[in-house]
């Protein structure tokens, strides 16, 4: 019994939490652009200043701790391609092909993104349990601000006309 511990999973703020904390951005586009990492709201940091350093630190430190990735530039490309596929059915073969990596590597890299709470897979909802297990999930990011940064979106106004909006 000695050494028991509690594990907390701290995700970005929810819309409800931002509303109750009175830090909700003035528009939906602004909320999507800024994302929901507490640091941005706590220190009033510009997302364009925060996310590039977050990505750099994440890739250089956290990813290397989780798995030895030889070519970090390919991993960053993979991360950006994942951001471009938010809300779409997961196609690891396509991701692997576009990055020039094996499907096994793409699968392993996705597990890194899931383990570090960057991405999650939304499983399909079917009454038939077997269908839920075999149907293709959709890919999502926990934080929209991070995804915007990876997609080189520079301000909330760009979201209005961005080809991935929806």
For each feature predicted by the language model, list its residue ranges.
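Short, hinge-like loop/turn segments at secondary-structure boundaries
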Residues: 1-4, 25-26, 139
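A short helix-turn-beta junction within AAA+ P-loop NTPase domains corresponding to the substrate/partner-engaging
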Residues: 1-16
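Gly/Ser/Thr-rich beta-alpha loop segments that engage phosphate groups in nucleotides
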Residues: 5, 37, 89
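Short secondary-structure boundary/capping segments
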Residues: 7, 21, 29-30, 130-131, ...
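Conserved small helical "lid"/interfacial subdomain of P-loop NTPases
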Residues: 12-27
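Conserved AAA+ ATPase small/helical "lid" subdomain
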Residues: 28-56
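Accessory nucleic acid-recognition modules appended to NTPase machines
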Residues: 45-166
């Amino acid at each position: 019994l000695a050494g028991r511990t509690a594990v907390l999973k701290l995700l970005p703020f929810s819309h409800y939490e931002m509303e109750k904390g009175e830090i909700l951005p003035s528009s939906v586009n602004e909320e999507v652009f800024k994302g929901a990492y507490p640091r941005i709201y706590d220190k009033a940091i510009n997302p364009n200043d925060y996310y590039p350093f977050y990505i750099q630190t994440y890739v250089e430190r956290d990813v290397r701790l989780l798995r030895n990735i030889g070519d970090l530039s390919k991993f960053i490309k993979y991360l950006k391609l994942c951001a471009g596929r938010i809300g779409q059915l997961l196609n690891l073969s396509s991701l692997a092909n576009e990055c020039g990596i094996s499907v096994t590597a793409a699968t392993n890299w996705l597990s890194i993104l899931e383990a570090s709470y960057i991405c999650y897979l939304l499983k399909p909802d079917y009454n038939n349990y077997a269908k839920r297990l075999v149907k293709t999930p959709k890919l999502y990011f926990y934080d929209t601000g991070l995804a915007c940064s990876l997609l080189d979106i520079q301000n909330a106004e760009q979201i209005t006309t961005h080809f991935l909006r929806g």
